[in-house]
Regions:
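Extended extracellular/luminal ectodomain segments enriched in beta-structured repeat modules
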Residues: 17-24, 58-62
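Solvent-exposed segments in extracellular or luminal domains encompassing
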Residues: 298-303
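Proline-enriched interdomain boundary motifs that mark the N-terminal boundary
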Residues: 255-262
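Short proline/glycine-enriched turn/loop motifs at strand-loop junctions of beta-rich domains
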Residues: 20-21, 30, 276-281
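Short beta-strand elements bearing conserved aromatic residues within extracellular beta-rich modules
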Residues: 282-286
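A short beta-strand segment in extracellular, disulfide-stabilized domains
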Residues: 266-275
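Secretome/extracellular-domain signature
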Residues: 45-146
Length: 303
């Protein structure tokens, strides 16, 4: 029986259908891009964030996964602000509604997100992705590019909002050939200011809990609340072949029995039993008024 599912960046929607059970979900955001030779020439990547949590699914559930891409590859998939080779890193998220990565209903159905790092240009730092919030991208001009938070996109210097990140989207600069993009995330990171390059902010992460912020139009209900949450800004430091793409992982922690009742009245009920691990379903006992009436040991998964 499969107990682990891994997802790498694919530039498209991916999906998985899980049986009832207790699971751990993990997401790593992608690193932001940089124009030039990082570190040796003074460029500093914004690293992707890491978020995880544990959830109990009480019914069979189909989930949609969007895995961010390293900003050096020049894509804007899953919220990365476009900036040529200095694009922001894409966010990695798991959501309840599929479709194109940027469709509004899909963005409003995300239950866990790891932010992407901000892109960087001209010997500055890109901000790291969240985690609880993305960090600041630095600028030689003092034009700060803030990271996304739980409640709003990162803000740049221009007061008209043209440099700011948005819900699910990092900022794309007016001149992508010489400026960096903000990291994707729950809320995306900003880029510094019109006409300036330098480092952009990282996107924020998110994990749905009882106390987490739910924006207007948000659709997931309390059945998708997580516990044992971990949110680490800049938590994706894995590099493979000079790139640090996002990734996602789902691990089955505990298999569970479950029962689907299709009809019932005062004298009879029609039901179907199953188990996350069918080999562990060995018998069905039914009771009336706490009195055992029958034990079924054959054809256990028939209706």
């Amino acid at each position: 029986m499969q107990t682990e599912w891994n997802f790498d960046c694919a530039n498209i929607e991916q999906n998985v259908t899980l049986k009832p059970g207790r699971y751990k979900f993990e997401c790593w955001g992608a690193r932001g891009g940089a124009l030039g030779t990082p570190f040796e020439s003074g460029f500093y990547y914004g690293y992707g964030g890491y978020c995880s949590g544990e959830i109990t699914l009480k019914k069979e559930t189909t989930l949609y996964l969007y895995v961010g891409i390293d900003g050096r590859k020049g894509y804007n998939f899953n919220g990365a602000g476009y900036g040529n080779g200095a694009s922001g890193g894409g966010a990695t998220d798991i959501r309840l509604i599929g479709g194109t990565w940027d469709n509004e209903q899909g963005l409003l159905s995300r239950i866990i997100v790891a932010g992407g790092g901000g892109g960087t240009y001209d010997k500055q730092h890109g901000g790291d992705g969240g985690g609880l919030k993305g960090t600041l991208g630095t600028s030689s001009t003092g034009a700060a590019a803030h990271g996304g938070t739980q409640f709003e996109g990162g803000r740049g210097r221009d007061k008209d909002g043209s440099c700011d990140g948005f819900f699910g989207k990092g900022a794309t600069p007016e001149n992508p050939s010489s400026q960096s993009g903000g990291g994707g995330g729950w809320f995306g990171g900003a880029y510094p200011a019109s006409g300036f390059g330098n480092g952009s902010g990282g996107g924020s992460g998110y994990v749905l809990t009882k106390d987490s912020y739910k924006p207007p139009g948000y659709t997931p209900t309390s059945e998708y609340y997580f516990d044992n949450v971990v949110m680490t800004t800049g938590g994706n430091t894995t590099v493979v072949g000079n790139y640090s793409d996002g990734r996602a992982k789902i691990t089955l922690l505990q298999s569970l029995p479950f029962l689907t009742v299709s009809s019932y009245n005062s004298t009879q009920a029609t039901f179907k039993a199953d188990h996350t691990d069918p080999t562990l379903l060995t018998k069905i006992e039914y009771f009336i008024d706490d009195i055992l009436k029958e034990t079924i040991t054959t054809d256990l998964t028939l209706e």
